Amino acid sequence: MTKFRGCIDIHSGQVKQIVGGTLTQDDTTELNHKSTTTENFVSTKPSSYYAELYKNAGINGCHVIKLGSNPENDEAAKLACQSWPNNLQVGGGINGDNALEWLDVHKASHVILTSWLFSDSDEGKEFDWVKLKRVSELVGKSRLIVDLSCRELRVDDKIEWVVAMNKWQTLTNNKLSAEFLGEVSQYCDEFLIHAADVEGLCNGIDVNLVAKLGEWCPEGFEGKIVYAGGARSVKDLDTVSKLSDDKVDLTYGSALDVFGGKLVKFDDLVSWNELH
């Protein structure tokens, strides 16, 4: 059954909502005050506030994403996990060296891996199956989420979704498909998929991608694919439910009132989950 999932995006140590396509620089201390990233919302509240908000509302499976290598992002993510230990999924800069620390020390429920899973090849960035298998064995399949966020590519009137890494700026050689998702699913517990072209714009979800994710959903992964990007109405949950045959979950960002948005009320999403 489709459900609402929560997110906590962290940039420069603060909870923010940004336009995904503008995240072209690493978030370092030096760039804090001259970033080119377009911000929709910058919270005055700590990450722990949002962790407790989701906890008290019973919104499970929420993710915390560190947008850049700024050490302040690590501290904010740790604070969120301390507020709801063993319940939040953490991504952004996670690799084979620090994954266990986030799980066992900082008490994330899952780690979300993206860019580290890709290696250089003669043709560009290629999904590294050796790395995937290694980290899956290290942390356990049940604690690993693979982020396969993507950008839309049109070739001869055919729509394809190419997996994007490096803050969604670098296109890889891998495209989303039933076969690809099926193979990756053998080593992880969930997928997180941002539609990078519509992320943060509040102009509507990528309905074609949502439908395909429902079609391509591996057996046993119903309710384990989280789509993010463009949600602007509570009715988007109904749309995702219908298009994906209840196999895909939906997260909201810039449209949500708790992130300064004016289109969607958090309480309405909580009620939707309770009713369904």
Swiss-Prot record:
SUPFAM superfamilies, per database record: Ribulose-phoshate binding barrel
Main localization, broad class: cytoplasm
Reaction(s) catalysed (UniProt annotation): 1-(5-phospho-beta-D-ribosyl)-5-[(5-phospho-beta-D-ribosylamino)methylideneamino]imidazole-4-carboxamide = 5-[(5-phospho-1-deoxy-D-ribulos-1-ylimino)methylamino]-1-(5-phospho-beta-D-ribosyl)imidazole-4-carboxamide
CDD domains linked to this entry: HisA_HisF
SS bond list: none
Keyword Amino-acid biosynthesis attributed: yes
Protein's name according to its UniProt entry: 1-(5-phosphoribosyl)-5-[(5-phosphoribosylamino)methylideneamino] imidazole-4-carboxamide isomerase
